[in-house]
C-alpha cells in the first residue's frame, strides 16, 4: 500500500490544551467532502445515502479519533437531525449552509473532511484514494492532511475504502496534537480592515477621537496592545483605511469556554464606535469570512 502523508500547520489548532491547569481537548467531527456552492446540501445527502463507502469511512475515522481520546461528534447523528423537518426549516434561516452548517450547529472545534475517489484499471482491478483534511472551524485554516492510496484489487469501493483506512498514519494524529497546542499557546490570528464609508466625512488620518486628542489609529494601537492575546497585535495604515492584525484566544482564560472570533473582534468594534460616537459616526461590520473581518465607519443614524 502506498501511503503519502503531508501536513500543513498554519496558525491554528488541533489537540490537547492546558486550561487553568487542566487538559482540554477540542471537539472533532468527521464529515464527507463535497464541492461547495449551490446544491451543496443535496450533494451531502447523495454522498451519505447513495455511497456505502462514505458512512464507513466517517465511522472508521471517528473510531480512530476516539481510540486516541479525542472528543468526537457523530456526523451521521447530525445528518439525521437535519432531516427532521422542524430542524431543517430553522436551518434555512442560518447564515451558514452546507457542511459549514453541520459543523457550526454541532459546535465542532475541528472538522475533518474525507474524500474518496475510485479508479478502475484494465483487467477489472480498482483502487481508491482517500484524502483527509483537518480544518479549524472558525477560520477554515487547513491544519493537517493525509493522502492514502489502496492497493489494487477486484473489490467494491466500500471494500477498497476499508483497506485504505488501515493505512492511516499515527503521525497524522500526533500532528493534530502539536498543532492544537501551538494554537492555544499563540492564539488565532485575525485580520480586521477598517474603512470609511464614501458618504462619511471622517478623516481617519487627521481627526482626533475620544478624550485624549489622539487619532483613531493611535487609540486602536494602544487598545490592541492591551487586549490582543498576549499583547500580540499591531495596527497598520493601508490605503484609505486601517489594518488591524491581532491574536485572539481559543478559550477564555477564566472560564475555559471557547472564544469566538466574532465576539473578540466585536470588542474592538464597540471600542471604536465609542470613540466616534460624539462625532456622529458609528462602526458596523460590513463582511466577515473566517479570520477576515471588514468594518466600516458610517454616519450615525438619527
What are these regions (language model features)?
Residues 39-106, 111, 214-252, 256-277:
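N-terminal segment of the mature soluble domain
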Residues 31-33:
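Short hydrophobic segments within beta-strands
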Residues 110-154, 290-302:
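Amphipathic beta-strand/beta-sheet edge segments enriched in Tyr/Trp
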Residues 115-120, 231-237, 284-285:
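Short amphipathic beta-strand and strand-loop transition segments with alternating hydrophobic
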Residues 19-29, 38, 142-232, 267, ...:
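C-terminal/domain-edge helix-coil "capping" segments
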Residues 20, 102-105, 122-124:
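Short, charge-rich binding segments
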Residues 1-21:
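Bacterial Sec-dependent N-terminal signal peptides
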Residues 35-37, 78-82, 117-121, 150-154, ...:
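Solvent-exposed loop/turn segments at secondary-structure junctions
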Amino acid at each position: 500500500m502506498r501511503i503519502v502523508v503531508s501536513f500543513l500547520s498554519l496558525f491554528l489548532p488541533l489537540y490537547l490544551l492546558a486550561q487553568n491547569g487542566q487538559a482540554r481537548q477540542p471537539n472533532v467531527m468527521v464529515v464527507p467532502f463535497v464541492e461547495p456552492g449551490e446544491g451543496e446540501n443535496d450533494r451531502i445527502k447523495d454522498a451519505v445515502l447513495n455511497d456505502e463507502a462514505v458512512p464507513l469511512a466517517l465511522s472508521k475515522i471517528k473510531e480512530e479519533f476516539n481510540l486516541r481520546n479525542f472528543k468526537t461528534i457523530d456526523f451521521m447523528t447530525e445528518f439525521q437531525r437535519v432531516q427532521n423537518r422542524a430542524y431543517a426549516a430553522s436551518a434555512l434561516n442560518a447564515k451558514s449552509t452546507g457542511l459549514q452548517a453541520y459543523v457550526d450547529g454541532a459546535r465542532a472545534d475541528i472538522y475533518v473532511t474525507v474524500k474518496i475517489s475510485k479508479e478502475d484499471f484494465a483487467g477489472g482491478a480498482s483502487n481508491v484514494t482517500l484524502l483527509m483534511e483537518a480544518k479549524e472551524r472558525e477560520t477554515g485554516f487547513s491544519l493537517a492532511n493525509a493522502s492514502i492510496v489502496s492497493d489494487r484489487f477486484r473489490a467494491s469501493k466500500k471494500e477498497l475504502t476499508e483497506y485504505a483506512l488501515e493505512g492511516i498514519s499515527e503521525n497524522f494524529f500526533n500532528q493534530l496534537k502539536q498543532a492544537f497546542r501551538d494554537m492555544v499557546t499563540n492564539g488565532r490570528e485575525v485580520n480586521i480592515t477598517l474603512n470609511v464609508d464614501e458618504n462619511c466625512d471622517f478623516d481617519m488620518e487627521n481627526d482626533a477621537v475620544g478624550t485624549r486628542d489622539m487619532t483613531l489609529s493611535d487609540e486602536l494601537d494602544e487598545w490592541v496592545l492591551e487586549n490582543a492575546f498576549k499583547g500580540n497585535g499591531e495596527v497598520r495604515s493601508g490605503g484609505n483605511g486601517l489594518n488591524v492584525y491581532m491574536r485572539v484566544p481559543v478559550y477564555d482564560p477564566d472560564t475555559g469556554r471557547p472564544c469566538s472570533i466574532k465576539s473578540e473582534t466585536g470588542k474592538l468594534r464597540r471600542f471604536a464606535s465609542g470613540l466616534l460616537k460624539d462625532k456622529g459616526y458609528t462602526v458596523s461590520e460590513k463582511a466577515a469570512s473566517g479570520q477576515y473581518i471588514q468594518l466600516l465607519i458610517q454616519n450615525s443614524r438619527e
